[in-house]
């Protein structure tokens, strides 16, 4: 699924009311009637297409026949569901474009989360309200732990790759990611999984770290990609963000098993409760807390790879709290989309987005 910011779209394309008003002012009589007839035919066509989609696609996409690693979908004898979730507290033309793009590419019918949310579920007041809406769905939707979940921000994420192709791509990406981790340790993938380490939750990436910080582990400790050295041309890594490595977690998109995602979202909300600081400027940023958990996971992985020691020079920068025992979870199976194979963020990528 290649994703773009809908801010590039011309609003006039979707502003039917304004366009109709101009027609009434400039073309009365026969022209107005013709416009109304065309508008009605357009609505009828759209309704017909939606009904056809509902008949043939039903509620959830069947992903049982898509090739996948056995640890991601536990049983090949049941039909795993695909959940397509869109956090959005209001309905507008951007949200409609996001939903339409998903339907056109045969994803399961999107579920809007947090619509008209109030109090602590009001995403207009705090982005972390999005996490509460996601948690509520993952705990109460009745889905199985090995169902596949896709979550996209409701105002700026457009699907462009068909669902079947995206699902196959996801499983391939996670299998390759597990193989790289196993190779780093000189073990097999099965042995890697026995240690509890694996990759299942794939988040989008940014070229810049946000919220910005020179000392926060989110911004300096997370791993670099394995992209070719000059992937962005001769200016790669020369200081301009548009030519830098895309390695920082972006919380706007994620794909992964429902069970793993549920545990991770629960952990993010627990972190918010434990570390809440009313005076912290970015206290309401869901991305801050999610990226903090990712940085701690990577910190512990590097320590485990090096006999309990962190291999890099800290040089006055902050590091996460080390794992404190069996009940202190640091491994959440989080990976990021270094290659833009799942999502293509627009920030700092204007030159490379067609």
Language-model features, listed with the residues they occupy:
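Short, low-complexity, Lys/Arg-enriched N-terminal segments of secretory-pathway carbohydrate enzymes
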Residues: 1-39
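N-terminal anchoring/stem segment of glycosyltransferases
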Residues: 29-148, 175-176, 183-184, 259
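Generic preference for well-ordered alpha-helical elements
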Residues: 92-96, 124-131, 156, 160-164, ...
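Short coil/turn segments at secondary-structure boundaries
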Residues: 96-100, 114-115, 162-165, 215-217, ...
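A generic structural motif
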Residues: 110-120, 179-187, 203-205, 279-287, ...
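GT-A fold catalytic core of metal-dependent nucleotide-sugar glycosyltransferases
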Residues: 138-214
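Intrinsically disordered, low-complexity, Ser/Thr/Glu/Asp/Lys/Arg-enriched terminal regions and linkers
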Residues: 194-249
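Catalytic core and acceptor-binding pocket of nucleotide-sugar-dependent glycosyltransferases
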Residues: 229-354
